[in-house]
């Protein structure tokens, strides 16, 4: 067992010596009905945090190397699938036992080296896992960049999983989620819907190719593949809204916005939510009030979507890349970058806790919050 120091805060108070010890035991099974958070960090840890106590519950040791540490959960919340080993492999870890139950290499053919740039997820029924491979053929005198492919794996294939289907895919694909009807939604130059049986990609939300009058082309940097309580697939964009057809950049209004797909219905949304005053790496709507939008990087910010207005912003000890809500929407958990998870009250925007994890930085991990 490993002793972990966890420090909680009263709202509005400063960090103090209110620490206690939590024990992280690989053999601890998760409890039905309890809410947890999973995140990863160096050297190669998968952590489970109990959100009732905001304490580390257990730590699973992962094989091979860390990076990026992106986590996707099976629908029954029993298995965490992690893209790791420098973007080269996907591992499935049973959360109750820390046992590895799945492994797939992104590289599938002799002579190639392939990586997935955050592009993987689990199907809505948990039976399949999807990845986008970006292969390069390593020849004696040159490298050949090959066509990306969408690979489909059976999740019960064990530790040497091979694709059961493969299809050509567009370039520059990143995060993805599976809809309730089996449609795969993938972010790239546009947001696509994909038939995973035929490999057909169809533009669902134009991004690079949008035609919004008097708007500049949007800019999208979003690699945090979040499974949300709102059951949506969302990513942020920035754009400029011009005053007229002259499209003068000097008078344009810089804006932040949100692309979103409802995973239950497939309904899409392209919504500006506020002025662009700073950069956020990830953002999420409140589970209890869909009109409230939050974003994080160097500050934690809250917006009123209808009014397109910044309501509050909180100062952070350091940058955080990834944000998550608890199910009630009352607390926000900030992860990524260093080795601590910061906890904020969603209403007051005051820090109310901090969990320091064993090991090193979380870097560019994607954390997930769930109820078993």
Give residue spans per PLM region.
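Bacterial N-terminal signal peptides that target proteins for export
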Residues: 1-9
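Bacterial N-terminal signal peptides
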Residues: 8-17
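Predominantly soluble domains enriched in secretory-pathway, periplasmic, or organellar proteins
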Residues: 18-372
């Amino acid at each position: 067992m490993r002793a972990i120091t966890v420090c909680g805060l009263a709202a509005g108070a400063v960090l103090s010596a209110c620490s206690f010890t939590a024990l992280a035991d690989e053999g601890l099974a998760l409890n039905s009905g309890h809410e947890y958070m999973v995140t990863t960090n160096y050297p190669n840890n998968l952590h489970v945090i109990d959100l009732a106590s905001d304490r580390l519950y257990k730590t699973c040791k992962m094989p091979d190397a860390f990076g990026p540490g992106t986590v996707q959960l099976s629908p029954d919340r029993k298995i965490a699938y992690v893209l790791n080993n420098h973007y080269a492999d996907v591992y499935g870890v049973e959360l109750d036992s820390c046992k590895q139950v799945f492994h797939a290499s992104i590289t599938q053919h002799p002579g190639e080296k392939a990586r997935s740039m955050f592009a993987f997820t689990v199907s809505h029924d948990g039976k399949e896992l999807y990845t986008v491979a970006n292969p390069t053929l390593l020849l004696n005198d040159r490298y050949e960049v090959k066509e990306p492919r969408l690979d489909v794996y059976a999740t019960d294939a064990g530790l040497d999983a091979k694709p059961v289907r493969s299809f050509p895919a567009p370039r520059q694909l990143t995060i993805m989620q599976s809809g309730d009807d089996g449609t795969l939604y993938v972010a790239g130059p546009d947001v696509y819907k994909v038939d995973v049986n035929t490999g057909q990609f169809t533009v669902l939300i134009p991004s690079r190719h949008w035609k919004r009058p008097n708007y500049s082309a949007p800019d999208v940097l979003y690699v945090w593949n979040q499974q949300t309580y709102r059951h949506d697939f969302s990513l942020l964009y920035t754009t400029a809204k011009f005053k007229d057809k002259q499209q003068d950049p000097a008078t344009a209004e810089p804006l932040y916005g949100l692309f979103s797909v409802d995973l239950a219905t497939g309904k899409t949304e392209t919504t500006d939510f506020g002025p662009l005053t700073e950069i956020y790496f990830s953002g999420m709507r409140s589970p209890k009030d869909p009109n409230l939008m939050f974003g994080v990087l160097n500050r934690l910010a809250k917006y009123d979507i209808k009014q397109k207005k910044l309501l509050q912003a909180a100062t952070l000890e350091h940058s955080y890349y990834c944000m998550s809500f608890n199910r009630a929407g009352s607390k926000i958990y900030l992860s990524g970058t260093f080795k601590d998870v910061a906890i904020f009250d969603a209403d007051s925007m005051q820090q109310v806790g901090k969990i320091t994890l064993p090991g090193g930085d979380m870097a560019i991990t994607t954390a997930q919050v769930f109820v078993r």
